[in-house]
Regions:
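Bacterial N-terminal signal peptides that target proteins for export
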Residues: 1-9
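Core segments of small alpha/beta cavity-forming domains
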Residues: 29-112
Length: 176
């Protein structure tokens, strides 16, 4: 009988210990490869968003707002909730807000919209080089050098990465 109590107590202690440790993910250092991959994923999202998303046939709508031509974003990112969710795959909440502001994205008649323009990128993210500028436990600044097409030139950008317990490493700021 006494053996059963000790076994039961042991099982309860182990399960409590495992439960307590589950949500406590410690920040692991961000490797240069992980930093480059996250930046490349962000760049893909950025290009899609600044081009309005992936429009379906007949979905593209424009309007005049404060003397400028605007377009509604595609249906998969046409609400603040959808757009934020898409950006939060690679960015922090603060970074996503900054991105929307910097790119002139507004809410108009309950839909997200932006100034009408088209963007093309020749940045070759698959061969980007990464240099660590500053590192703390849950914040890192990396400088990425990304070649531009076949021009033999490159663009340097500073990425600030922040570790969030719930989501892991995310981009907080991009300086071009």
């Amino acid at each position: 009988m006494r053996q059963k109590w000790w076994t039961l107590l042991f099982v309860i202690c182990i399960s409590l210990l495992l439960t307590a440790c589950q949500g406590n993910r410690a920040a692991t250092p961000l490797s240069p490869v992980e930093a480059a991959n996250l930046a490349a994923e962000w760049a893909t999202t950025e290009l899609a968003v600044v081009n309005g998303g992936f429009y379906e046939e007949g979905e593209y709508e424009t309007f005049l707002y404060k003397g400028m031509n605007y377009r509604y974003l595609a249906s998969h990112i046409d609400s603040k909730k959808k757009l934020t969710a898409e950006l939060r795959k690679t960015m922090t909440k603060k970074g996503a807000k900054r991105f929307m502001k910097d790119n002139g994205i507004i809410s108009y008649k309950k839909r997200m919209a932006q100034p009408e323009a088209e963007f093309v990128s020749e940045l070759m993210w698959n061969v980007a080089t990464v240099k660590e500028v500053k590192a703390k436990k849950s914040k890192m600044v990396m400088e990425l050098t990304v070649p531009i097409g076949e021009t033999r030139t490159a663009e340097k950008m500073k990425f600030t990465y922040v570790y969030k317990k719930r989501h892991g490493w995310r981009i907080d700021k991009v300086e071009k």
